[in-house]
Amino acid sequence: MVLPPKDHPRYKSLLAREKLVSASNVVAKQGLIAHGRGEAFDYLLGEQTCFPALSAIKAASSAIAAAKNPVISVNGNVVALAAREVARLSEVSGAKVEVNLFHRTPERVSGLTTMMKKVGIKALGEDADDLIPGLSSERAKCCSDGIGSADVVLVPLEDGDRCEALVNMGKKVITIDLNPLSRTAQTAHITIVDELTRCLPLLSEFIKDGKGLSDFDNKKCLSDVLKYIAERISS
């Protein structure tokens, strides 16, 4: 991996790109396109965690803390960018971690579980024995003791139809998505419109400290994010 100079004004963004490229054996090429789209929205947010996102993070903290079987669903982008942050969240919340992929191959699942093992997490995913109803082919696969039986699922950087399928299964779905207009953002119960590596440490901190928010309206939160973006652009 080629490290960008630390004095570069966009060091964190460049580092994220390098991490994705370096993990090209487990990150789908389509994931690079999705990351670039997210970066564009982060520009609009000023590359900072806005107040509506903080409210969503607190709501997510409450939901995960109250869950009986919380699961963090991770894909190639999530592991490449934030394996340590996911491990920390799993540690403080007790949530299981499951590798769940849109472009699923045994090699990618194995590679990603190995990457999570290096940060101390035994991730589920290799022995998928259950299916998510409403999805076709390989991407429907999941683990019965993970996503299959979860009551709350955190699905960062997820695609819209799988998010909708999890909601239809009766699960409480939390997502992290920089695009407040995406199907995923609009479908989830709690949408954190923030950059992955910026909000995961906050989520872990809020769970550890017992900071939460029980009264939360996702549609209003997304509307507030759009207002925040509009005000930034017009100011």
Residues of each region from the PLM?
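Electropositive, gly/pro-rich neighborhoods at or near active sites that engage anionic ligands
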Residues: 1-95, 212-235
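Active-site glycine-rich loop that binds ribose-phosphate moieties when present
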Residues: 130-148, 154-161
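A short, gly/pro- and small-residue-rich
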Residues: 160-181
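Long, charge-dense
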Residues: 89-140
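Gly/Ser/Thr-rich loops at beta-strand to alpha-helix junctions
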Residues: 74-84, 103-107, 158-161
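Short, acidic/turn-prone active-site loops that include or flank metal/cofactor-
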Residues: 102-104, 178-181, 196-198
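Alpha-helix C-terminal capping/helix-to-coil transition sites in glycosyltransferase folds
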Residues: 66, 148-149
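C-terminal functional extensions of proteins
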Residues: 183-235
